[in-house]
């Protein structure tokens, strides 16, 4: 059995997808790359098909990250699932996954992990460091102290059996599906935030919308999901 299935949802990512996929060429652990596209009208799919045999394209006209991730996971054969975004970079990728799997080997109750998420250092601002520092601390506290599963879509690593046990992502959620997934995973095992499992990303939404607006959207969506079971926003638009 393949050790790791890496699922990458895409939508108009022709500028990032090649670099994102090729970084896994430095990973010696047996793995497969699955690109799940939401109907890109640029060269994303064309590029992806030169990099991996497993590319799926959603054609229902209303792609969401949850639908794309579930579609990718349906093609997976690995013992573990890694969901990451199409613009994420993982520093020292070989040691990154060696550390991750060592944690699963050491604790058989562990079903999923996540870690710090930081913006590329060359474009990171003071406000990025402040608000992401707070976010990372909150995710750590909720997972490691309260035992309440919380994860974000930029990096999620889990046992595939646990993912299947809870029927994957809730396709009824337009956003916040990553938080919901880890919340449910915590009912079947441990979820943990690992400080040494940091990833980097370009912060396009943070810089494109600005932190005040983004924090308002995030907070409102979380409250709406808790109270009403669905998101406040009706569409999660990509920022490119």
Residue ranges of model-derived segments:
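A conserved acidic beta->alpha catalytic loop
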Residues: 37-45, 88
């Amino acid at each position: 059995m393949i050790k790791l299935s890496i699922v990458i949802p895409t939508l108009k990512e022709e500028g990032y997808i090649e670099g994102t996929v090729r970084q896994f060429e430095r990973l010696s652990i047996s793995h497969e790359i699955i690109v799940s596209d939401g109907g890109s009208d640029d060269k994303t799919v064309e590029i992806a098909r030169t990099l991996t045999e497993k590319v799926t394209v959603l054609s229902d006209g209303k792609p969401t990250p949850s639908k794309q991730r579930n579609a990718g996971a349906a093609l997976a054969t690995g013992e573990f699932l890694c969901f990451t975004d199409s613009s994420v970079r993982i520093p020292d990728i070989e040691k990154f996954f060696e550390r991750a799997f060592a944690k699963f080997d050491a604790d058989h109750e562990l079903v999923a992990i996540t870690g710090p998420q930081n913006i590329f250092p060359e474009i990171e601002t003071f406000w990025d460091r402040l608000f992401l520092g707070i976010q990372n601390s909150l995710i750590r506290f909720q997972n490691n102290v309260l035992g309440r599963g919380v994860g974000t879509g930029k990096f999620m690593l889990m046992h595939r059996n646990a993912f299947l046990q809870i029927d994957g992502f809730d396709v009824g959620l337009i956003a916040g599906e990553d938080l919901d997934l880890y919340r449910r995973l915590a009912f079947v095992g441990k979820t943990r935030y690992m400080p040494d499992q940091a990833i980097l990303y370009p912060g396009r939404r943070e810089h494109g919308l600005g932190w005040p607006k983004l924090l308002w959207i995030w907070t409102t969506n979380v409250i709406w999901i808790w109270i009403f079971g669905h998101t406040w926003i009706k569409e999660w638009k990509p920022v490119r």
